[in-house]
């Protein structure tokens, strides 16, 4: 299960569209759904300058990472676009206050603190995120498991870090059990059945924040934009009538491996090479297997996994799951789910592309496709 970094992606110009597996929860980007009241943003800043291509760009540190918005104005004034971006960033702040395990005052932290206690009321959004998490956990056989956090807290991946002791992991491993997330749809209440159990929604909540920010922009009439948060990306519409393109960063060196034409879909990439440490000659990467509490063994891990889905919420969670499964099992899972697409780079550097994505992937002969060499790059996902 990923604790932190998500492989950087790069953004340029071109487009296509694919849906993601259905879930019993509402689409976080449903346009007719009213956006909840976000916390009052800071006083409005001056509108971002309009760039030569007719876009404005802004970024902010939220949910422990960098969120950015690239918005094509069309014939709208920059002041309106700037106000829409401010509102979208405020929406991300609101999501963080609900679903961040890092904020002691968040609703999720309060649920964690109540682990082993009685059922308690949950906000509709947290309830839906947990319900969706359970659906994906079951679909992936536990490769995605938000209850990993009880063990995940034992790991640090900063330079000079050391692994936890095996007995420390063994003592916490029984707390990793998505089935022990109890939800009552009739009352909207929930609880964690095991004392000491902790949820970490970093592998789904950032995607949800991206989706909600994109929804705010659409509701304000800005249908052409890219919202990115720590490597979780949602691409909406086009830029000046030309589809956007997302470039897949090479895991071994700077530059784009290939580019994916994208419009009205999400693209999320997970990689194990950006956040790791070495101890006594062994490499420990940040992607943890919920079944063992240890990082994925290097011999069965992928260098990077890119997953495409209808929204960033699903793509976020499925990218984690496929990375945990490993290249062969992960690609087989994707091929068995028509609403997912993937690009996987295995440990040997071989590139695996899901069947339906192969015709649309742009393979430059010697360099990234035109326009993809100077993209807005997603940052390393923060822990």
Q: Where are the regions a protein language model picked out?
A:
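Mature catalytic core of soluble alpha/beta enzymes
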Residues: 2-11, 15-383
């Amino acid at each position: 299960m990923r604790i932190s970094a998500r492989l950087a992606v790069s953004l340029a110009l071109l487009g296509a569209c694919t849906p993601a597996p259905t879930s019993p929860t509402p689409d976080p980007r449903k346009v007719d759904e009213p956006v909840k009241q976000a916390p009052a943003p800071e006083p409005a800043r001056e509108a971002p300058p309009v760039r030569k291509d007719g876009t404005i760009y802004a970024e902010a540190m939220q949910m422990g990472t960098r969120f950015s918005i690239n918005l094509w104005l069309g014939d709208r004034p920059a002041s309106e676009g700037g106000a829409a971006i401010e509102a979208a960033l405020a929406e991300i702040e609101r999501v963080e206050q609900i679903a961040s395990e890092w904020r002691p005052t968040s609703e999720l932290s309060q649920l964690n603190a109540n682990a082993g206690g009685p059922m308690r009321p949950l906000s509709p959004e947290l309830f839906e995120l947990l319900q969706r998490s359970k659906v994906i956990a079951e679909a992936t056989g536990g490769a995605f498991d938000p209850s990993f956090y009880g063990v995940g807290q034992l790991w640090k991946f900063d330079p000079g870090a050391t692994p936890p002791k095996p007995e420390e992991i063994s003592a916490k491993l029984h707390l990793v059990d998505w089935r022990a997330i109890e939800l009552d749809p009739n009352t909207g209440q929930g609880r964690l059945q095991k004392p000491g159990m902790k949820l970490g929604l970093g592998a789904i909540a950032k995607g949800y924040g991206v989706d909600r920010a994109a929804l705010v922009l659409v509701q304000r009439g800005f249908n052409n934009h890219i919202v990115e948060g720590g490597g979780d990306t949602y691409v909406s519409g086009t830029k000046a009538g030309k589809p956007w393109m997302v470039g897949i960063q090479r895991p071994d060196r700077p530059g784009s491996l290939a580019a994916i034409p994208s419009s009205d879909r999400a693209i999320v990439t997970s990689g194990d090479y950006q956040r790791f440490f070495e101890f006594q000659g062994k490499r420990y990467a940040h992607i943890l297997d919920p079944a063992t509490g240890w990082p994925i063994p290097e011999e069965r891990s992928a260098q990077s996994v890119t997953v495409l889905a209808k929204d960033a919420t699903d793509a976020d969670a499925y990218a984690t799951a496929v990375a945990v499964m490993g290249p062969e099992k992960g690609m087989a899972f994707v091929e068995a789910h028509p609403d997912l697409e993937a690009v996987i780079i295995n440990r040997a550097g071989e590139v695996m592309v899901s069947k339906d994505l192969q015709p649309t992937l742009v393979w430059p002969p010697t360099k990234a496709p035109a326009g993809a060499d100077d993209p807005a790059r997603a940052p390393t996902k923060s822990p």
